[in-house]
Amino acid sequence: MTSIDINNLQNTFQQAMNMSGSPGAVCTSPTQSFMNTVPQRLNAVKHPKILKPFSTGDMKILLLENVNQTAITIFEEQGYQVEFYKSSLPEEELIEKIKDVHAIGIRSKTRLTSNVLQHAKNLVCIGCFCIGTNQVDLDYATSRGIAVFNSPFSNSRSVAELVIAEIISLARQLGDRSIELHTGTWNKVAARCWEVRGKTLGIIGYGHIGSQLSVLAEAMGLHVLYYDIVTIMALGTARQVSTLDELLNKSDFVTLHVPATPETEKMLSAPQFAAMKDGAYVINASRGTVVDIPSLIQAVKANKIAGAALDVYPHEPAKNGEGSFNDELNSWTSELVSLPNIILTPHIGGSTEEAQSSIGIEVATALSKYINEGNSVGSVNFPEVALKSLSYDQENTVRVLYIHQNVPGVLKTVNDILSNHNIEKQFSDSNGEIAYLMADISSVDQSDIKDIYEQLNQTSAKISIRLLY
């Protein structure tokens, strides 16, 4: 703790009070007796104890797909060994690289299948530096006791802004006019070009992105309807509708913000396009499986749909490159790109400097907390379990992290093993077939740690164990 100049601190406090007070307000500085206690108060703050794992070497992190530098900085500050690649890896190389790492960070192109994950003998957690987690075999990861984290918040604004840009671009046919002028054609027209003020935006999925989009759209004068499978409080004057058909019938623009699940696959197909207003527009910046693109193509050709903006596709190129978005990837590509007023972008919804920086911080922080403290808050496949950080004055305290099958009798078995020590705190929760127990036990020495580890390792319901001290 650095020394503190009490006089400077007192003067700074007085200046801050004077600047923040209203005209004529009377402010008094802290008493000298209070200021004299400041160093003692600051020194009394209990800083979180940096824990280390038992029976594990240095933590190794593998980062793929050009994960943001903010994540690398956070991991290196923790003392982890970081291996970084700008692109995804071929499966054979990925299998080789993943064998001895404790955590891996990916974006949307890397596929962590059961075939890959079965070779990851030391893997503790996975960080998806994006919203989606469908590129990870979550069931297999869970069965192995591997926690998976994502970034549900950080790119929400960037995606919402892209959709706003696409709404205006579709309404004014900006994509077509730009292409024409790039090829030397001057085509100044007003036919079928509209202001967005007074039009109705229908949002399918009113989560982090959908709700932010709602606020931005209303600020531009759009009326907002939204459909969600759960009842969600509206922001502003937006209104929730009870059925998807009602939203489709009433909306001039329809935008999707839903995850890729069996229930959302092709949720906009021929019947839904038929239910939409004549001349409506479709925007998909969520997942490539939620819109049936061949049906969309037919609806555009029939002049039922006046235009569409797509940022995601059922199959996407593994890396950047000319000619990679073609009919071999998706059989309808040539037909789609030939249509008028179709805006196609290469999955860039969250591709802003701000979003990637925030995602790096959000996911790297979650992974670090899980590695260092066992905190699983924010995991997409684990129960959310957390205990207060240990402090440095808890010298002989060990944190037990026990991931196990969700079957009867486990807590009794574990507590019998821990009963010779003082269990200071304990938290257990379950999620489907997996359960997670976290316990802080005191009065433990090095020989006790080894004995506890070996006993827990022999329990029949054990999936994985970590002891932090």
Curated annotation (Swiss-Prot):
Extract the GO molecular function terms from the UniProt entry.
Answer: alpha-ketoglutarate reductase activity; NAD binding; phosphoglycerate dehydrogenase activity
Sorted keywords for this record are: Amino-acid biosynthesis, NAD, Oxidoreductase, Phosphoprotein, Serine biosynthesis
Give the ACT domain ranges: 399-469
A GO CC term attached to the entry: cytoplasm
The entry marks the following residues as binding NAD(+), namely H208, I209, D228, A285, S286, R287, D311, H347, I348, G349, G350
The catalytic activity, as recorded, is:
(2R)-3-phosphoglycerate + NAD(+) = 3-phosphooxypyruvate + NADH + H(+); (R)-2-hydroxyglutarate + NAD(+) = 2-oxoglutarate + NADH + H(+)
Q: Which domain of life is it from?
A: Eukaryota
One Pfam family this sequence matches: 2-Hacid_dh_C
EC number assigned by the record: 1.1.1.95, 1.1.1.399
Q: Which family does it belong to?
A: Belongs to the D-isomer specific 2-hydroxyacid dehydrogenase family.
What's in the misc comment field? Present with 7670 molecules/cell in log phase SD medium.
Question: Can you name this protein?
Answer: D-3-phosphoglycerate dehydrogenase 1
* Natural source organism: Saccharomyces cerevisiae (strain ATCC 204508 / S288c)
What gene name is listed for this protein? SER3
